[in-house]
Amino acid sequence: MILEEACHSLKLECAFRDLGFVDIGWKCVAHAGIFFIQPVGFPDYPDGELLGFSLTLPNTHDMRRVRLMRTAKRALDYATGVDD
């Protein structure tokens, strides 16, 4: 999957769950629970290969990645506390 498709996937999952997201250029960032979720890939262009969806905590000084999930659904499940 490419990063642009990953953004569309994240937006669709947010729409299903009534969660918010913001478009920043071609990228998108979702807010779920206490996390911000965004697709991460290499290279960092719309046609770059997706590595996963990162979950980060706001207001951290080092902005380290808290967790990297394979799909937008799993990332949002983790962020909102939904268990399988």
Region locations from a protein language model:
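A short, exposed loop/beta-hairpin motif centered on an aromatic-Gly-Thr core
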Residues: 29, 56-74
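Short, compact, well-ordered microdomains
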Residues: 53, 69-70, 77-82
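Terminal low-complexity, poorly structured segments
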Residues: 6-8, 15, 46-47, 51-53, ...
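Negatively charged, low-complexity tracts enriched in Asp/Glu with abundant Ser/Thr
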Residues: 1-32
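Compositionally biased, low-complexity segments enriched in small residues
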Residues: 7, 20, 67, 73-76
